[in-house]
Regions:
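Short, conserved, surface-exposed binding loops centered on an aromatic residue
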Residues: 31-32, 41-43, 79-81
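Short beta-strand or tight-loop elements
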Residues: 36-38
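Conserved catalytic cores of phosphodiester-cleaving nucleases, focusing on short active-site segments
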Residues: 40-59
Length: 151
């Protein structure tokens, strides 16, 4: 199980590095420790960011919303409250990168409770809440990861 999460975290960060090398959004990116709720911190000029990364096997036009787990949303917002790092939720899709600055949402996220099959825990998992972010609140870059794909 730990290997599954380790591999995903490494691939998430690799995607972020490659995307940033092409788009130059950040001056620096620093990974957070393993199993932290936040994947990385980043800087651009005088701005600092807390970054959560997610990879989704879907095209950008499949849904009008993208979900975030409630604990990740709350952790990013607490990070902003206590450190001033702007909360970014970065989603790598099949054909695009969708970036939400959670401080700049124009519409309140909807909440849902749902059951999912967890690949990491290999069982049906009950989640208390997920927030659904309106894709219109995001900045979207057309981009495709060139070097590797998730399995």
């Amino acid at each position: 199980m730990k290997e599954y999460f380790d591999m995903n975290e490494k691939q998430d960060l690799q995607q972020l590095y490659e995307f940033n090398a092409e788009k130059h959004l950040f001056d620096s990116i620093t990974p957070c420790k393993y199993s932290a709720q936040i994947d990385a911190t980043a800087k651009h000029k005088d701005r600092q960011f807390a970054v959560e990364i997610k990879h989704r096997l879907m095209p950008k036009d499949k849904y009008k919303t993208i979900m975030i787990e409630d604990y990740k949303y709350l952790e990013l917002m607490l990070e902003y409250q206590f450190t001033g790092r702007e909360p970014l939720y970065i989603n790598f899709l099949n054909d695009a990168v969708v970036i939400f600055n959670l401080n700049k949402l124009k519409s309140k996220p909807k909440q849902k409770v749902l059951d999912i099959q967890s690949n990491g825990y290999d069982k049906l998992q009950k989640l208390e809440r997920r927030y659904y972010l309106d894709i219109n609140d995001a900045v979207i870059y057309d981009w495709k990861w060139k070097t590797q794909q998730y399995s």
